[in-house]
């Protein structure tokens, strides 16, 4: 394969030209968007901008700057004519001179640094004097202006004498007199400003050529420069340094015979001394060594080729300004010592403030002591800085731990706050439920009160009570009337007009929430009519548990019962609990207290008389006891008025909790008991009328008893006994009193037995014995007891009553202690007495069946 490129078509114009075949232009078809839509792949404006930025050239700014420079150069070439050869030579000479001066200045600065460092190591730093370097110039040549430097530190003492070059190289030629004068002026300027450099040989040659070509221009320039330098040297003459010791005046006159040299020496002589160089100048050179270099670099960067005279004058002015810097801004050694003392004093204050050990000031002499104190101060400062940094780190760690603890405490506080809010919400809900319960209870109490008030039967019973009171009054006024009021057996709860009403549905936990007695209505008008009608007791009374009895009742029962009994009727405890509850709900008064004491005493006496009652047989006289039905009806009425007392276990005044099951069973038997007991009450009234009816003076005794009983019952109907707290001493006194009353009751019963024996053995005598035990009233602290003697009835009527009602004996014995308000001589207030008429035909059976206190045991 050949790499030679050959013209395929041959030379132009030769041969046959080939015809160009025109391509057929194909018709552009329209884009079919139905196949694929490529607009989704089109770049967004942001993508286009990013791509442009990516593909831009990195050197764009540099190229732009270069292009601008080229354009500026073109304009400058067009505007400015070409520089002459003289200007080019002048610029080259100045560059050479200035470069040499700059290099020399750098070398001097480095040596100054080295000397200052060595001076700090040795206490006796070298003593140096000012030298005047003099350069012998070649004939017919002038020295170029150099940068003035006032630093004479590194200049060695070259000679003991000051020899001017003009004294050694004097020329008698008058033509060169101006040149010598100019050279002498230059040497004067050099002495004034302590010049320390010399020009190169090349510079001299160039200047000689320039002088030959342009002597007039150079002479004019140098005259201007000399005038400026002379004025500046006069201003800085006072700051000149002493020179070395000069030889004798004769030698001076011989060597320096020129007028310029004499004038300079006469000016410098008063200032000459043998003192050493000021150390502050040295320290200033060490501390401010770079200032002169910076100023010279600035001068170096400002070349001006358009005006050589301006260039030279600006260079000289910059050099003189640089020479003025050490004298004006350099601190002395004393100032530095004072400053380091201030630093040490501040460090001491800091040490006292922070509680550190204070270190004394160090007496520094010379630069060595200054350096030592400076280094020690720096070490102390660095140590304190390190300690403060460690303390700061510890504080940061402590702060982090405290922040963590604070976060934990905040979480705990938030949790406790949430718990408190939750408890507050629960408390609010509980209070709302309690308020709702109280409102519901109040509504139920109000509704129950209205229901009891609106019951029409109580008003009928009230009228019956009024009629009963009238009948008893009629018996008192008519002592010969044998009739006995048999309608005095209304239960205790329904005898008064001011009776406390108790709710049916909910009994409040606190007894103080029960409505007040003045708001209660007449209970006698709110009971159904069949309550006091004759009834038959179908079920015997249930034995209550001992937990339902109060502790006082248990003590009294154990004290009074001198013999064990097979069964104690529970209705007595029910009556006492009712009376105690009524006492807690009603206010305390003097009459109420008396009634309460009597009720307690007679209830216990009734118990003493009922210990052996269950052992009596059915063949006994049917009128064994009249108190059971009435008291049973009374307790049944009390239970019927509180049917919902034990829907919830409630705590009463004595702290006992009623049992729910027992109360539910009581609720079911309430109505049946009421009917049965009312029937028994009617039967007992009929039997009482039949027994007492035939006797004449019997009626007197019973009327008297009925009158006293009715009057006493009217007292108890008005108000109910209140609660009286019993102390152990009062309980013992009460027990002793009960025992005494029991003994008195035995005596009275013996008298009644004697009367019954007389009636049974002497049927021809009057039916009622004229011997009658008087009514006895005793008072102890406002208490009273009415005791009467009631003669028994004849045997035929007793047998008749027993045949008419064969179950009346059993029923009356079962319901003993329920209706004692009407005819009990032992307790006319609480309803717990017993009447046992004599039946001679059943004497033997009664002796076998009755208990320890049966009346038949006393019959002979």
From Swiss-Prot:
Pfam family, one: SPICE
GO cellular component, as recorded: centriole; centrosome; cytoplasm; spindle
Coiled-coil ranges from the UniProt annotation: 383-437, 729-755
Signal peptide: none
Domain of life: Eukaryota
PANTHER family, alphabetized: SPINDLE AND CENTRIOLE ASSOCIATED PROTEIN 1 SPICE1 (PTHR31167), SPINDLE AND CENTRIOLE-ASSOCIATED PROTEIN 1 (PTHR31167:SF3)
Subunit relationships: Interacts with CEP120.
Protein name stated in the entry: Spindle and centriole-associated protein 1
């Amino acid at each position: 394969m050949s790499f030679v490129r050959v013209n395929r078509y041959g030379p132009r114009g030769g041969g046959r030209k080939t015809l160009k075949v025109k391509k057929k232009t194909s018709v552009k078809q329209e884009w079919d968007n139905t196949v694929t839509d490529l607009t989704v792949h089109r770049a967004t404006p942001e993508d286009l901008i990013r791509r442009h930025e990516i593909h831009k050239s990195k050197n764009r700014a540099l190229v732009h700057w270069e292009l601008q420079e080229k354009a500026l150069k073109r304009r400058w070439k067009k505007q400015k004519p070409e520089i002459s050869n003289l200007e080019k030579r002048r610029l080259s000479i100045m560059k050479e001179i200035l470069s040499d001066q700059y290099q020399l200045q750098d070398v001097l600065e480095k040596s100054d640094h080295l000397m200052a460092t060595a001076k700090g190591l040795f206490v006796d730093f070298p003593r140096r004097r000012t030298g005047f370097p003099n350069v012998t110039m070649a004939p017919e040549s002038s020295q170029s202006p150099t940068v003035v430097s006032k630093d004479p530190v590194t200049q060695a003492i070259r000679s003991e004498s000051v020899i001017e070059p003009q004294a050694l190289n004097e020329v008698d030629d008058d033509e060169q007199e101006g040149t010598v004068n100019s050279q002498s002026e230059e040497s004067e300027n050099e002495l004034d400003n302590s010049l320390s450099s010399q020009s190169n040989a090349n510079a001299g040659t160039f200047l000689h050529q320039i002088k030959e070509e342009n002597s007039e221009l150079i002479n004019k320039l140098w005259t201007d420069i000399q005038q400026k330098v002379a004025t500046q040297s006069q201003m800085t003459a006072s700051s000149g340094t002493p020179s070395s010791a000069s030889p004798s005046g004769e030698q001076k006159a011989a060597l320096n015979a020129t007028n310029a040299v004499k004038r300079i020496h006469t000016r410098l002589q008063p200032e000459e001394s043998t003192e050493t160089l000021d150390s502050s100048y040295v320290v200033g050179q060490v501390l401010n060594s770079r200032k002169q270099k910076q100023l010279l670099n600035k001068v170096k960067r400002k070349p001006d080729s358009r005006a050589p005279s301006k260039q030279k004058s600006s260079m000289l002015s910059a050099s003189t300004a640089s020479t003025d810097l050490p004298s004006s801004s350099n601190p002395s050694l004393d100032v530095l010592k004072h400053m380091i003392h201030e630093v040490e004093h501040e460090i001491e204050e800091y040490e006292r403030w922070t509680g550190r050990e204070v270190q004394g000031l160090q007496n520094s002499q010379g630069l060595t002591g200054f350096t030592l104190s400076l280094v020690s101060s720096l070490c102390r400062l660095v140590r304190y800085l390190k300690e403060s940094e460690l303390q700061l780190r510890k504080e940061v760690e402590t702060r982090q731990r405290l922040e963590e603890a604070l976060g934990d405490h905040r979480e705990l506080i938030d949790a406790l706050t949430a718990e408190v809010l939750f408890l507050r919400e629960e408390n609010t809900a509980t209070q709302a439920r309690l308020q709702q319960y109280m409102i519901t209870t109040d509504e139920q109490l109000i509704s129950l009160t209205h229901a009891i008030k609106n019951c029409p039967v109580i008003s009928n019973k009230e009228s019956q009570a009024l009629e009963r009171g009238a009948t008893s009054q009629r018996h008192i006024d008519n002592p010969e009337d044998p009739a006995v009021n048999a309608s005095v057996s209304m239960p205790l709860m329904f005898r008064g007009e001011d009776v406390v009403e108790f709710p049916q549905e909910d009994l409040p936990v606190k007894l103080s929430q029960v409505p007040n007695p003045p708001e209660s209505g007449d209970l006698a008008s709110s009971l159904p009519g069949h309550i006091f009608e004759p009834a038959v007791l179908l079920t015997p009374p249930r034995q209550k548990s001992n937990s339902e009895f109060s502790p006082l009742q248990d003590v009294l029962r154990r004290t009074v019962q001198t013999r064990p009994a097979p069964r104690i009727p529970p209705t007595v405890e029910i009556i006492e609990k009712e009376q105690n509850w009524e006492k807690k709900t009603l206010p305390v008064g003097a009459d109420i207290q008396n009634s309460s004491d009597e009720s307690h005493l007679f209830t216990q006496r009734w118990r003493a008389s009922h210990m052996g009652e269950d052992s009596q047989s059915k063949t006994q006289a049917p009128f064994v006891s009249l108190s059971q039905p009435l008291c049973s009806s009374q307790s049944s009425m009390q239970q019927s008025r509180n049917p919902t007392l034990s829907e919830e276990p409630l705590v009463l005044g004595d702290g006992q909790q009623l049992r729910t099951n027992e109360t539910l069973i009581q609720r079911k038997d309430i109505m049946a008991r009421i009917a049965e007991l009312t029937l028994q009450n009617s039967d007992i009234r009929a039997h009482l009328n039949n027994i007492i009816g035939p006797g004449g003076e019997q009626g007197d005794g019973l009327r008297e008893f009925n009158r006293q009983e009715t009057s006493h019952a009217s007292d108890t109907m008005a108000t109910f006994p209140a609660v009286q707290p019993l102390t152990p001493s009062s309980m013992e006194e009460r027990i002793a009193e009960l025992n005494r009353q029991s003994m008195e009751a035995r005596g009275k019963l013996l008298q009644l037995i004697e009367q019954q024996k007389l009636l049974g053995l002497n049927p021809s005598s009057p039916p009622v014995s004229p011997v009658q035990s008087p009514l006895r009233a005793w008072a102890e602290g406002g208490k009273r007891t009415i005791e009467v003697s009631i003669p028994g009835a004849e045997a035929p009527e007793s047998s008749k009553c027993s045949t008419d009602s064969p179950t009346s004996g059993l029923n009356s014995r079962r319901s003993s202690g329920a209706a004692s308000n009407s005819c009990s001589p032992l307790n006319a207030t609480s309803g717990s007495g017993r009447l046992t008429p004599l039946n001679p035909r059943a004497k033997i059976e009664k002796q076998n069946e009755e208990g320890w206190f049966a009346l038949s045991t006393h019959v002979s």
